[in-house]
């Protein structure tokens, strides 16, 4: 699949999140038609922004992304100064020591080397079964991100 859309698709039902009795939400990253990474969250009692937090994780493609895991960032908002959304990061320690699982890079910023990409957005993910050092540039680049809601 190519990145041919000029905008993102967002179902209008998201605006009525609290009226839908949502049980689970799955965020998945795809390369072509192949799912390459995912996080499933318990969404009972959640809002459209707080379903994506570490304490709600019930399943993940990374073995160490769990509700009991330790992260310095795990949120939709992410790391604002570097425009990293849907960011799951294990540890910051200056660019050469940053280790994480996934990030959506919105646009070019003066951040780390791994924040610079040829096109935006970028859907980045660790290709190993745990957090990876972002500066190794071994992360995968998904073609798209999808969010599935289970009622």
Residue ranges and their predicted role:
Residues 1-151:
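Mature extracellular or lumenal effector domains of secreted proteins
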């Amino acid at each position: 699949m190519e990145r041919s859309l000029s905008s993102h698709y967002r179902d209008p039902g998201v605006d009525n999140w609290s009226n839908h009795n949502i049980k689970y939400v799955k965020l998945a990253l795809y390369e072509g038609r192949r799912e390459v990474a995912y996080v499933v969250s318990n969404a009972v009692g959640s809002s459209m922004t707080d379903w994506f937090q570490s304490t709600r994780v019930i399943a993940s493609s990374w073995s160490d992304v769990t509700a009991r895991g330790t992260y310095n960032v795990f949120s939709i908002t992410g790391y604002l100064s570097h425009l990293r959304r849907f960011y799951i990061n294990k540890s910051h320690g200056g660019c050469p020591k940053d280790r994480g699982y996934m990030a959506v890079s919105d646009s070019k910023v003066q951040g780390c080397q791994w924040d610079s990409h040829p096109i935006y957005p970028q859907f980045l993910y660790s290709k190993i079964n745990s957090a990876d050092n972002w500066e190794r540039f071994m992360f995968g680049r998904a073609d798209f991100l999808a969010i599935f809601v289970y009622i």
